[in-house]
């Protein structure tokens, strides 16, 4: 056996401790980041999928990292993702990401392509354009539970909001309560920003992207249980999840044995001993709505049109990073958690703000967030964009998906005429 591999062999006890500590790094609150995924289309050939080489050529001359600290990656289906640098504040994150997005947009348009807002590409069949051992193994793993995984991997786009885990106190800036609040607000955030209308399973959905994700392997896509010890629960969740990728350095297939969990592997049930690298790769494949990665990663939000990605980043920050606002927001969303678990998330994906009480709660949370953003010193233009979004959609019980659906109806009527 390779000597380096032996040195890095991992026990179940070591893995449990690592996942628990790495998931929630305790510290002060205030840093903000975002990851913006964009669908990419050639307007002259809207049903085609730009090849990876064309995408690489489009961004080849951009610096890495970008001036604002962001980095560009190509996703499995040819989506482009901008991962922002870590801002010391919301204002810094938004300013830097706007500057980086301007460079990315200009480069893409100069190549004859277009970045599209929206959570799901409903026009093109799901097709993976990147051929890497990891993505090939993930696709084989997802295929075991149905076709949804390919669609999510290749045709979806989201806004991910990244905030500090929180400190080690028991207050609303402590990681225990922040984890609870992030989960409790999650279905509401999903409903507010739903932007991928479609039909699946005989139902119409506001966020088809998210319901397809929930239809994948439940052990890696559904929310962990809410307990008094989030570190312990996250370690349990991660080790109970099935392994989707087993890396190899000799060119062998990376496909994981069917049914193998991380705990099974740590107990000797895998094709070889598990290492810290394997564990980190496994953690990176888990996609619950809120994922602890040393910070909190909000993953339930569909991509928005234009610069409206700013709104979820600001809303989540305003509700989470001001202690007064966080405590009041908790009281608003607490009654929405009557059933908990998967039902709340699926209902939000299907009905958006049509669920009884959700519009009122969301509107109240927007008002709270604006107060919190003011106390956090957020610039006026960010607060105005948040307020405008709320007036256009939330207070009317609408979400961006309703606009998309209405445009499709008008287009269908025009064609029929």
Label each PLM-derived region with a short phrase.
Residues 1-149, 155, 180, 194, ...:
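Terminal catalytic/cofactor-binding subdomain
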Residues 79, 158-162, 297:
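Active-site scaffold segments
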Residues 109, 116-146, 152-291:
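Loop-rich catalytic cores of soluble enzymes, especially ATP-dependent carboxylate-amine ligases
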């Amino acid at each position: 056996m390779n000597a380096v591999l032996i040195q890095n062999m991992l026990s179940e006890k070591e893995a449990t401790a690592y996942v628990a500590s790495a998931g929630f790094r305790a510290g002060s609150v205030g840093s903000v980041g975002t990851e913006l995924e964009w669908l990419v289309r050639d307007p002259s050939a809207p049903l085609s999928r730009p090849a990876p080489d064309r995408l690489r050529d489009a961004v080849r001359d951009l610096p890495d990292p970008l001036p604002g600290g962001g980095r560009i990656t190509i996703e499995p289906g040819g989506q482009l993702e901008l991962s922002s640098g870590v801002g010391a504040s919301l204002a810094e994150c938004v300013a830097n990401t706007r500057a980086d997005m301007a460079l990315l947009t200009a480069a893409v348009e100069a190549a004859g392509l277009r970045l599209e807002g929206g959570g799901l590409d409903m026009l093109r069949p799901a097709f993976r354009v990147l051929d890497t051992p990891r993505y090939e193994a993930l696709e084989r793993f997802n295929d075991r539970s149905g076709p949804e995984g390919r669609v999510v991997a290749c045709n979806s786009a989201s806004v991910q909001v990244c905030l500090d885990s929180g400190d080690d106190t028991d207050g609303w800036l402590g990681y225990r309560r922040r984890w609870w609040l992030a989960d409790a607000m999650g279905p509401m955030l999903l409903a507010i920003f739903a932007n991928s209308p479609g039909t699946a399973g005989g139902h119409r959905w506001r966020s088809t992207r998210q319901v397809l994700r929930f239809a994948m392997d439940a052990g890696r896509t559904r929310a962990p249980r809410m307990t008094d010890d989030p570190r312990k629960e996250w370690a349990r969740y991660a080790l109970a999840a099935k392994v989707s990728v087993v890396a190899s350095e000799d060119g062998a297939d990376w496909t994981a044995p069917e049914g193998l969990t991380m705990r099974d592997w740590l107990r000797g049930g895998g094709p070889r001993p598990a290492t810290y690298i394997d564990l980190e790769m496994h953690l990176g494949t888990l996609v619950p709505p809120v994922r602890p990665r040393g910070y909190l990663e909000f993953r339930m939000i569909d991509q928005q049109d234009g610069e409206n990605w700013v709104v979820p980043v600001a809303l989540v920050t305003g509700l989470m990073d001001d202690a007064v606002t966080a405590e009041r927001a908790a009281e608003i969303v607490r009654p929405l958690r009557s059933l908990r678990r998967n039902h709340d998330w699926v209902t939000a994906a299907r009905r958006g703000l049509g669920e009884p009480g959700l519009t009122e709660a969301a509107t109240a949370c927007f008002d709270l967030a604006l107060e919190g953003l003011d106390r956090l010193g957020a610039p006026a233009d960010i607060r105005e964009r948040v307020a405008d979004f709320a007036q256009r959609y939330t207070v009317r019980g609408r979400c961006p998906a309703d606009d998309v659906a209405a445009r499709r109806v008008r287009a269908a009527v025009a064609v029929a005429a």
